[in-house]
Every structure is written in structure tokens, then in C-alpha cells.
């Protein structure tokens, strides 16, 4: 049987449900697919299928994530849901499934809880740009003023972490009532679900496609071609490249080399242009083979700089996940795998009051590399020691 072709007729947007355990994230995900299945825009995925999320690996870390897809009249959505709190943290830090917007689920019976706050903080740090709130289980609260109070608390919480708390759409409803409702899409139990989908369509803008961002390609390999010059190969991370374009070679020192790409090739054929996602070779004008190496990046002039020091949120693998068996302190020196660069770095700063970091923790720390690498906020990386992954991180702030 031939694979079904993915037809791009509607803009594609990645979303996910976040929030405290048992506040109804998976039930809401099920309710969305049920409602849209009645309109012929999705396949219904029941709660028990969402809850037993399959395992996947990202940067050497195992994460349980459920992916569902559905459409509205306007868009195609890929929606992620994680069963466990640790899975959310690992997903956000590794960027296994990136989100253009998040649906924060808060139970009206509880209001914001510790994990609510933690998920919002992480969403801010990894730059999830838009947030929509679904106040769930409203059928279990008799006094509407209590729901108003929960809404105020959630708006305050979002504002605290840099989201526009006053503007964020807040929808009230019961995901369970929608899941249990009859199969008539006009039934009133589905109204909040439709409101939520309208908010997603209208409040989360179409994401900027990777191909429209400034060009960047991590260098994987370098070859010398007699009579032609030096070729660097890699997978284009973002943007586009055409013969004649000026680029910079960045990383491994503070010196930035400028050059021109004279030819772009894929499978030994010359291309008019390489775009995000393509594996290409770029022929560089006037660059010797020993002037460029794996771990550097080729980038649009002025778009990224080399740095040694940065702050990052790091998830430290548990022993059971193949991580360290013992805690570490300031001064710990593992390897950092940043794009194609593999560089030693030192933990030079931990949060106030944190003396040691235990396997299973996630902590913001300051890192100093032994040489500069092309780094920017939101950059994901792996932490390795003795040939095994011991952690995963995301850059939250570049220092120098």
C-alpha cells in the first residue's frame, strides 16, 4: 500500500496541552479529536490511547509523547500530550516536539498548582510564543465567582512569567462532558471545545517557516576538491542558500571568516538553491581545507555570534535512564554537544541555595565552554560524559 501523501492546503501549526497532573490535559485532547471527528476533520483518539503514550528518543533521552493530528476549517494541527510531569520537562528541554502555542489546562476545582507554574516557566524559557487557557471541570464548581477567581489567578501567573495575561484567551468548560456527550456536533457540551479551537485559529499566528529565517547550516564534514576548492557539507537548519550568497564561518574562535558560496550541490547535482531541511555541499571561495572544521556553522552575515558563556536549563538524567549515579557540583566538566560541535565546558554557576545537582533534577545553570561556539537563546544541546548522555539542555540566556 502506497503511503498517503501529506497534502499541504492549510497552514500547519504545532500545539500541545500543558498543566498540572490530573487537571484534564489528556481528556481535553480526546475531546478535541472526538468533536472534530464528528465534523469529519479528525480521527477520534480516546483517552486511554492518549494516556499510554509511546516512547521516543530525543538527544539520547527517552520521552513518552502522544501525537495527534486534526484540522479546523482554517488549519492543520499537530498536537502533543505527555502523560507524566517528567515527560513534559524532558520534552520542553530537548525540543523533541516544538510548540507554536500551548493550551494551559487548569482545573476549576484546584486553580493553578505547582506544576502549572513549572510548565509556564519552562514554556517561557524555551520560548513557546503563545498561550491559551482552558479552565476545565467547571461543571464541578457551583459558584461561578470561584471560577472567576481561578481565571484571575491564572492571568496573574501568566503575566508573572512574561505572557500577556490580560490578553490571553481563557475558555471555560468540561472536557469530560464533551467526551461523554452524544455524537451530535451541535450538542452544547462541545461549545467550549469549538471556542477553544476558534481561539487557537485566531490567537496563535501562522508560524514563521524555517525557510524564511536567516540561513544557517551546521558543518558536518569538510572536503578538498582538487581544482575547485573546499566543500563543507551539512543539513540546512534554516533559511535558504544560493550560489553567490555571502556567508560567515562561525565558531571555535572569536574570529569570524567571511566567504562566498560559489556552488550548492545535492547528490552531486548543482542546485539553484538549497532550503531548510536539505542535505547539501557548499563550495566556499578562497577558503583552505584547514581553515574550516566540523562544529562550526555557515550562516547569513550578522545572524549569529560565537559565545563561550551562557545560562541554560538542564535536565539531568536519572540513573535508570542511563545517566549519572551520583550528583555533581559547581566545577563539573562534561562535554557539550551543540549542533555538530563537541566541546568541553564547566558548570560555573548554580542557582542560589543549590549546592549539588542530583540525577533527575532540572536546574538552570551557567556554563563556560573552553572555546566559543555559535550559540543563541533557545538552542538545544546534549550533555555527555564518557560516551553517554547525562543530560539535555536549552540555552536561556547568552552572556558573552
Swiss-Prot record:
Positions contributing to GTP binding: 19-26, 81-85, 136-139
Protein name, as recorded: Elongation factor Tu
Gene Ontology cellular component list: cytoplasm
G2 as annotated region, ranges: 60-64
EC code(s) of this entry: 3.6.5.3
Family according to the record: Belongs to the TRAFAC class translation factor GTPase superfamily. Classic translation factor GTPase family. EF-Tu/EF-1A subfamily.
Entries under NCBIfam families matching the protein: EF-Tu, PRK00049.1, PRK12735.1, PRK12736.1, small_GTP
Keywords noted in UniProt: Cytoplasm, Elongation factor, GTP-binding, Hydrolase, Magnesium, Metal-binding, Nucleotide-binding, Protein biosynthesis
Substrates-to-products reaction catalysed: GTP + H2O = GDP + phosphate + H(+)
InterPro entries hit by this protein: EF-Tu_GTP-bd, EF-Tu_GTPase, EFTu-like_2, EFTU_2, G_TR_CS, P-loop_NTPase, Small_GTP-bd, T_Tr_GTP-bd_dom
Protein residues bound to Mg(2+): 26
Oligomeric and partner information: Monomer.
Positions of region (G1): 19-26
Domain of life: Bacteria
GO biological process: translational elongation
Sample GO molecular function, one term: translation elongation factor activity
Sections of the chain in a coiled coil: none
G4 as annotated region, ranges: 136-139
Cellular location(s): Cytoplasm
Pfam families named in the record: GTP_EFTU (PF00009), GTP_EFTU_D2 (PF03144), GTP_EFTU_D3 (PF03143)
EC class (word): hydrolase
Sequence segments annotated as region (G5): 174-176
Start and end residues of each tr-type G domain: 10-208
Coarse class of the protein's main subcellular location: cytoplasm
Amino acid at each position: 500500500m502506497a503511503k498517503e501523501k501529506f497534502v499541504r492546503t492549510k497552514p500547519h501549526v504545532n500545539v500541545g496541552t500543558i498543566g498540572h497532573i490530573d487537571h484534564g490535559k489528556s481528556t481535553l485532547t480526546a475531546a478535541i479529536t472526538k468533536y472534530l471527528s464528528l465534523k469529519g476533520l479528525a480521527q477520534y483518539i480516546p483517552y486511554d490511547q492518549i494516556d499510554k503514550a509511546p516512547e521516543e528518543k530525543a538527544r539520547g533521552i527517552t520521552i513518552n509523547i502522544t501525537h495527534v493530528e486534526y484540522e479546523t476549517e482554517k488549519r492543520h494541527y499537530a498536537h502533543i500530550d505527555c502523560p507524566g510531569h517528567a515527560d513534559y520537562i524532558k520534552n520542553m528541554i530537548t525540543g523533541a516536539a516544538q510548540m507554536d502555542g500551548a493550551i494551559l489546562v487548569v482545573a476549576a476545582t484546584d486553580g493553578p498548582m505547582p506544576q502549572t507554574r513549572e510548565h509556564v516557566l519552562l514554556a517561557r524559557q524555551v520560548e513557546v510564543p503563545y498561550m491559551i487557557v482552558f479552565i476545565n471541570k467547571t461543571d464541578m464548581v457551583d459558584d461561578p465567582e470561584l471560577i472567576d477567581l481561578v481565571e484571575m489567578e491564572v492571568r496573574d501567573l501568566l503575566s508573572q512569567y512574561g505572557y500577556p495575561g490580560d490578553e490571553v484567551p481563557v475558555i471555560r468548560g468540561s472536557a469530560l462532558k464533551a467526551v461523554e456527550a452524544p455524537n451530535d456536533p451541535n450538542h452544547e457540551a462541545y461549545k467550549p471545545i469549538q471556542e477553544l479551537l476558534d481561539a487557537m485559529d485566531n490567537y496563535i499566528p501562522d508560524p514563521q517557516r524555517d525557510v524564511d529565517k536567516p540561513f544557517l547550516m551546521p558543518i558536518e564534514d569538510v572536503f578538498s576538491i582538487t581544482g575547485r576548492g573546499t566543500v563543507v557539507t551539512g543539513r540546512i537548519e534554516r533559511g535558504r542558500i544560493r550560489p553567490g550568497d555571502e556567508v560567515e564561518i562561525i565558531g571555535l574562535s572569536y574570529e569570524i571568516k567571511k566567504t562566498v558560496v560559489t556552488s550548492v550541490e545535492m547528490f552531486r547535482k548543482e542546485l539553484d538553491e538549497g532550503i531548510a531541511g536539505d542535505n547539501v555541499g557548499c563550495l566556499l571561495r578562497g577558503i583552505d581545507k584547514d581553515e574550516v572544521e566540523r562544529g562550526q556553522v555557515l550562516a547569513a552575515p550578522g545572524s549569529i555570534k560565537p559565545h563561550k558563556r551562557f545560562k541554560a536549563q538542564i535536565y539531568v538524567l536519572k540513573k535508570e535512564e542511563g545517566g549519572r549515579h551520583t550528583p555533581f557540583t559547581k566545577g563539573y566538566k562534561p562535554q557539550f554537544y551543540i549542533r555538530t560541535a563537541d566541546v568541553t565546558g564547566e558548570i560555573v554557576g548554580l542557582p542560589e541555595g543549590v549546592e549539588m545537582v542530583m540525577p533527575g533534577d532540572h536546574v538552570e545553570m551557567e556554563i563556560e565552554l573552553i572555546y566559543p561556539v555559535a550559540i543563541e537563546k533557545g538552542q538545544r544541546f546534549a550533555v555527555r560524559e564518557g560516551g553517554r548522555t547525562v543530560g539535555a539542555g536549552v540555552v536561556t540566556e547568552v552572556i558573552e
